[in-house]
């Protein structure tokens, strides 16, 4: 763990967390106050975000990535990987739309994942880095 005190009393720390396949699930746990999904729903969203990240490693446009992610073939693969029934999958997808986790896009049937739930990653094939800034609401 690296701790670097810089100007104005800011504390910066690097904390390595081995998480491999659980990264996107952990990311969504941090965002739980925003989405308030159940564990099973969070697992499904994490599978979508992980698949999207995998697709981002290609040279495809963002629109193409979103279209592939929301294709019936990708949805079926993701549903099977999370081991949920088709009916339950459809209920969760409806809930995602209702809560703006999936947002409308005229080019993509069923919408696309709200960028709020997609982490902006610095990806070097071995490590994924995310910067969290916890801001004091009182400004102190």
Annotate each language-model stretch with its function.
Residues 1-9, 103, 117-123:
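Eukaryotic partner-binding/assembly regions in large regulatory complexes
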Residues 84, 89-90, 94-109:
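A short, conserved structural fragment
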Residues 1-36:
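Positively charged, structured surface patches that bind polyanionic biopolymers
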Residues 108-120:
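Minor-groove-contacting beta-hairpin "wing" of winged helix-turn-helix DNA-binding domains
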Residues 71-73, 88-91, 111-114:
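Short glycine/proline-centered loop/turn elements that form peptide/ligand docking sites
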Residues 65-87:
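Short helix-coil junctions and helix-kink-helix linkers
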Residues 37-73:
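Short helix->loop/beta-hairpin flanking segments within DNA-binding domains
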Residues 117-140:
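Short, amphipathic alpha-helical interaction segments positioned at domain boundaries
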């Amino acid at each position: 763990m690296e701790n670097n005190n810089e100007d104005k009393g800011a504390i910066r720390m690097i904390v390595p967390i081995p998480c491999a396949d659980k990264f996107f699930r952990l990311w969504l746990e941090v965002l739980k106050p925003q989405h308030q999904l159940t564990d099973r729903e969070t697992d499904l969203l994490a599978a979508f975000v992980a698949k999207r990240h995998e697709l981002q490693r290609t040279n495809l446009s963002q629109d193409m990535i979103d279209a592939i992610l929301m294709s019936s073939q990708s949805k079926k693969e993701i549903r099977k990987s999370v081991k949920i029934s088709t009916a339950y999958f459809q209920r969760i997808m409806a809930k995602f739309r209702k809560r703006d986790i999936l947002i409308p896009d005229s080019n993509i049937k069923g919408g696309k994942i709200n960028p709020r739930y997609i982490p902006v990653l610095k990806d070097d094939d071995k490590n994924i880095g995310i910067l969290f800034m916890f801001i004091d609401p009182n400004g102190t």
